[in-house]
C-alpha cells in the first residue's frame, strides 16, 4: 500500500512538472546516471522480495527481533522509507522553483531518514532471529542491498552533491 503512495506521488510530480522533470538529475554526470537507473531497477525488484519475505515469514506478533522488539520495529522502518519518499519529489520540484535553505534541509532530512531506515531494515533482517531457511529470505537480503545503496549512498549522499550545482 505504501509503495503505491510513493509511485503515485512520483507520477503526479512527473506529470504536473513536465518542464522540470529533466532537472531532477541536477548536475549528476551522465556517466553515472546509468548506474542510478540500474540500481533503481534492482531496488524496485528487491523491494518485492524483502516485502514478500516479511509478509510471509515474519509473524505480526513476532518477538524475534533482537529478542525484545516486536513487529512495530518493522512497521517503523517501513514507514521511515515510505512516508518521507512520498514527499521527496514535490519538495524537490519546490526547491527548483522557490529554493530556500529550510526546504533544502527538509529534502536532505527526507533522504537520510529513508537511507537510515532502509539500512536499519537490512540490519534487522540479517541479525534478527527470523526463519532464514527460505530462498525468499536470501532474495530479500540480496534485494535490500541495492535498495540500501540507492537510498543511503546514491540518494542521500551522492545526489545532493550534484543537485545544487
Give, region by region, the residue ranges found by the protein language model.
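First transmembrane helix
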Residues: 1-3, 51, 112, 120-127
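Alpha-helical transmembrane segments of multi-pass membrane proteins
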Residues: 2-18, 153-155
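Membrane-interface interhelical loops and short amphipathic "cap" helices
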Residues: 15-33, 92-105, 157-165
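Interfacial helix-start motif at the membrane-water boundary
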Residues: 29-48
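Transmembrane alpha-helical segments in integral membrane proteins
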Residues: 45-61
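Membrane-proximal helix-loop-helix units in multi-pass membrane proteins
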Residues: 59-118
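Terminal transmembrane helical module of multi-pass membrane proteins
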Residues: 116-165
